[in-house]
Amino acid sequence: MSKETIAVKAQEVEEVAEQLKSSVSAIVVDYRGLTVEQVTDLRKQLREAGVKMRVIKNKIMVRAADKAGFEDLKPVFAGPTAVAFSEEDPVAPAKILANFAKTADALQLKGGVIEGKVADLETVQEYATMPSREELLATIANLLQAPVRNVAYAVKAVAEKGDEDAA
């Protein structure tokens, strides 16, 4: 191997290691058997959620996992492997990939890194069932609005009852 090739691969290992460290979620999948159309659809869904999916050679992923301090992640890098990286929402990649796997049997979740910790398949599947950040924020907003709304309805009902009594 030439020195240039080695330098390029070392640079790629650095980039992937940094991406692993900076992502709140990096989910590893086996995409063997997916059609081009399915992969395109999956990438589109991930992109809409702000998630980037990359196909990276296993040797590079193993070295990057080592460099990033995720040695326990190395066993999942066997066979055709893709990694979905999210820098904002730790739930989005797991949720999208798990939902996609329900319709595309060929896609298999393997594990990943979630919020700085190596996650096995079971943990990834648990995250896939959690509500997303946006869903949680909407729920909190509704909970905060409910008391105000209830008071407004009560005041309106009292006012209407007062109008009926006056008539």
Curated annotation (Swiss-Prot):
GO cellular component, as recorded: large ribosomal subunit
Example of a GO biological process term: translation
Pfam families assigned to the protein according to its UniProt record, in alphabetical order: Ribosomal_L10
Spans through the membrane: none
Lineage: superkingdom: Bacteria
Record keyword Metal-binding present: no
Record keywords, A-Z: Ribonucleoprotein, Ribosomal protein, RNA-binding, rRNA-binding
GO molecular-function terms, A-Z: large ribosomal subunit rRNA binding; structural constituent of ribosome
Function: Forms part of the ribosomal stalk, playing a central role in the interaction of the ribosome with GTP-bound translation factors.
Similarity annotation: Belongs to the universal ribosomal protein uL10 family.
Database matches in NCBIfam families: PRK00099.1-1 (NF000955)
Subunit structure: Part of the ribosomal stalk of the 50S ribosomal subunit. The N-terminus interacts with L11 and the large rRNA to form the base of the stalk. The C-terminus forms an elongated spine to which L12 dimers bind in a sequential fashion forming a multimeric L10(L12)X complex.
Name of the protein in its database record: Large ribosomal subunit protein uL10
Encoding gene, per UniProt annotation: rplJ
